[in-house]
Amino acid sequence: MEEIQIYLQLERSQQHDFLYPLIFQEYIYAFAHDRGFNRSISSENLGYDNKFSFLIVKRLISRMYQQNHFFISLNDSNKNLFCARNKNFDSQIISEVFACIVEIPFSIPYINLEWKKKKIVKPQNLRSIHSTFPFLEDNFSHLNLLVDILIPYPIHAEILVQTLRYWIKDASSLHLLRFFLHEYCILNSFIIPKKASSSFSNFSKRNPKLFLFLYNSHVCEYESVFLFLRNQSSHLRSTSSGVLLERIYFYRKIERLVNTFVKLKYFQPNLWFVKEPYIHYVSYQKIASLASKGTSLLMKKWKCYFVTFWQWYFSLWFHPKRIYIKQLSNQSFYFLGYLSSVRMNFSVVRSQILGKSFLINNVIKKFDTLVPTIPMIASLAKAKFCNVLGHPISKPVWADLSDSHIIDRFWRICRNISHYHSGSSKKKSLYRIKYILRLSCARTLARKHKSTVRTFLKKLGSELLKEFFRSEEDVFSLTFHKASPAFWEVYRSRIWYLDIICLNDLGNPKSQF
């Protein structure tokens, strides 16, 4: 066990300092409002336009520590809800400041670069989620088994604080964070008397920056076991798509962790099975996938090891059913809005040596990505583009818009779906989805003009909608039709549009467009 602790031991000099006094330094707020700093951390989408100030934050923190805690009574619910709203506002301001202080260490390299070059540099902190698929195509086809791991969510606030203790020295900052989360969770339990997940979801919506920092830290701790496996195997390729919550807010991930195996001294499992020579790891949102060439017995040992480790390390009960073992050769898995699988193509080659001919059976593995037709149709039905059977219907709520706006809305949805699922191995199901949207658009226009679809298209011409729903592949075919056959073969193959930076609703069939 001493050898295991050395692998993930983080030196004191490399720990990240949380300087509690920074919260009470006025120049930090001027720094946060600086244009260059805002751009450097992509704050245009993070809400840095909130004009919090040093004086306001100082008063709010003092009031949070000194206030008399109120108790909700059934006779005076309106007054208490008013106080709760004020407290919500206070906590939101404090969380903004806390997240701002947290992001400063990640932004300093870009600020220094701006001063050196005397110009604003916007870091490439966003990656396409489709950058993961080339990794899968190159590597997953050589593997046999897949382990799908569902990371526990939501997380108890105390577990988050305990996780940060391993790489944050400042006790004052941790005390403030613990007190803040404790107050906020209690407050939400009063306002929303539902499950704990509702409280955590409300917290993530009101405090997105702080929530993302805490959640990323939590996921990094869960991935610590995979970092240990990478140290054990030189062939491990650990890749994270970085779409934990649709956008990347971390500029770098913690590569080394402190005392990961602190509590492992209480059990001594035989770790010989982690010597697997070839494994691959990829994660997105709250799902992690680990593929290997190993046997089913090896994967079962991994599952037992993961469950035991996480239960001891996080002091919580980790349900074994959150880890699924799948055979890649005969089972598909849902990944980033695709039904992915490893398909085996069998071919027979006739060979001849010294006048003797014989047949050679070859098996070529290919990574397939299919459009999940049934979940996609369910999403379209939920959004009122078709019924549950997939028959297109009109969109009455859009009938009051102009024709150009109606066509533009349908075109955008169709284009986004076409872009997102451009790398699909088989396009028939994608064409069906596009057909539903196209006919739904025609029915909506016909409903607006109080006519039938046939009469409307006959009056304006059937080419009206074809131009709007022309896919990029059709454009490529028109552009390169007269070019060399090599170009034609390239554009007939799968095309990954790497401008996709988030799952949005396309990757989540349960949500609505």
Curated annotation (Swiss-Prot):
Localization of this protein: Plastid, Chloroplast
GO molecular function terms listed in the Swiss-Prot or TrEMBL record: RNA binding
Highest taxon of the lineage: Eukaryota
Disulphide linkage map: none
GO cellular component: chloroplast
UniProt cross-references to Pfam families, sorted A to Z: Intron_maturas2, MatK_N
One biological process term in Gene Ontology: mRNA processing
Entry keyword set: Chloroplast, mRNA processing, Plastid, RNA-binding, tRNA processing
Keyword Plastid carried by entry: yes
Family: Belongs to the intron maturase 2 family. MatK subfamily.
Role played: Usually encoded in the trnK tRNA gene intron. Probably assists in splicing its own and other chloroplast group II introns.
This protein's name: Maturase K
Organism of origin: Byblis liniflora
Organism classification: Eukaryota, Viridiplantae, Streptophyta, Embryophyta, Tracheophyta
